[in-house]
Amino acid sequence: MHEEDFELTFDLEPLEPAPQPKAAAPAVPVPRAAASQPRPPAEPPTPAPVKTAAQPHPVPPARPAAQEAARPAVSVRETEKPRPAPAAHTAAPARGVLISGGDRGIGAAAARAFYEAGYRVAVLYHTNAQAAAALEASLPGCIALQCDVASRAACESAFTAAEIMLGHVDVLVCNAGIAQQKLFTDITPAEWQHMLDVNLTGAFHLCQLALPGMIRRKWGRILTVSSMWGQTGGSCEVHYSAAKAGLIGLTKALAREEGPSGITVNCVAPGVIDTDMMAAFTPGDKAALAEETPVGRLGNAQEVARALLFLAGEEAGYITGQEIGRAHV
């Protein structure tokens, strides 16, 4: 009996279908009606309200979802805008490169390679002012600065001048180095210390000077030039091998420390490269060394320079803490 009474009440409510034309007329307000009419039970008979009763959650969020999707699009762009800021440094003409030991050999070849790629170039030289002047003359706009990398004061002075002239140092190539062939038992403490000061401590000085600006700009490339003897050790070149091995260790550790700041640190460890540092070798010595090289010849400075140029580019942005070398580059 009571159930029949309920049925009578439902029969009385069909009067409300009269407002249904109103709900049908405003097709657009249907979502709003759906949000307000899930309360009355009279709408279950009509399929539209049943759907809207099942869709109250999807429908209201549908609009905010679209709006929120639009908002993130703006915020994403806003978050991406700061990233392109360092990307502005990715254009080669906007970059400045400082190369130590840039007056001859691998350093001079690197200066030419970076210059031809559109970089602003500054090189450091120690005593060969004539070679430095010739490099400046052949590369208009290139700057050559005298510097003994073993001296912290000299590095600070030269780096400040380079930064003023270049605008900023985005790429640092630590290439300055000396070599000496001598039995380990004959090496003097002064010779040992001088080898470390030039080949290892010089890189320490320049890296410390270059890093603050790179960290501030969240972008930078540090490249060190070691040697295969730093990887395998060379007889009669123990102090040289030790210094070059230290340079590889510096590279790997610094890469871990500076990676979060957008700075990569890599090392090139060339094999036997035919530069003026091999002036003391006889043709027979060079031929013997060439036979020990997998490709059967000595390397040249331009090949090493191209490796450095690659590591400085965006294409190598995911490469860090690596040493390219072993037998040869």
Which residues are covered by each model-predicted region?
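Short, small/polar-rich loop/turn modules that mediate ligand/substrate recognition or access, typified
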Residues: 259, 264, 319-321
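Residue(s) in the substrate-gating loop at a strand-loop-helix junction
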Residues: 227
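Conserved glycine-rich cofactor-binding loop
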Residues: 103-104
